Amino acid sequence: KPLTPEHTRELMEFMDKPALRLIEHGFFYRPPTITYSDRMQLYLGKTEFRLWHRRAHTPNSTLIYLPQEKVLFSGDIVCTIGIPCLGGSCLREWLQVLDELEALDFTTIVPGHGEPVEKSYLPKFKQELQTIFEMVRDRMGKGLTLEEIYDDVHYQPDLIHCSTKEYIGYCDAEIEKFRKATLREIYQQIEKGLL
C-alpha cells in the first residue's frame, strides 16, 4: 500500500526530532578542518584513499578510489538500482566522468545505492542515462512541451526511493516529483545546449 504525502511528512518530522533536541542542548555546526577542491590522498595505516571532486550527480560529487584494493566508491555517480533524481545534476560532465572511470584500474564499484558490482557495469549505467536523455531529446524534436514529455517519457522506476521489506521508502507522489525533476533537468539542459 503506497504511503500518503501526509504520512511521509509525519515520518520526516519524527526523524528530525532527535536533531532538534541536539540543537536545543547546545549542538553547533563544526566546519571541516581538512578540505580539498580537486584531488586528495589520505592514508589509514597502509591503505591509500584517493578522493576526486567531480561534477556529476551533483556539482560537488566525490569519488573515493582505493588503488591497492582496486575498489571505487562512486556515491550516486553510479547506482545499480535505478537512476537517481537528476535535478541539479551536471549531465554532460557526468557522462565524461563515466568515460574517465573506464580508464581507471579497478575491479569493483561500491555504488551510492544498490549492491557492489564489477567495473563492467559502467557501460550499462551510462547507457541507461543516455537512453533517458535521448528519449527527452526525441520528444523535444517532435515539438512536445515539458508537460507532454512528463506524460510521454517513462523509464525504470526509481528503485532507490521505493518501499521494500527493509526500507519504508518515499510515497508515490515524492517519487513522481523526482521523475519530473529528472525530466525537467534534462529538458532544460538540452534547451540551453548543455547536453
Language-model features: where?
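Accessory terminal helices/loops
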Residues: 1-21, 103-105, 116-195
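Short, charge-rich amphipathic segments
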Residues: 19-37, 60-74, 160-168
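Metallo-beta-lactamase
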Residues: 1-138
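Alpha-helical interaction segments
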Residues: 26, 83-85, 149
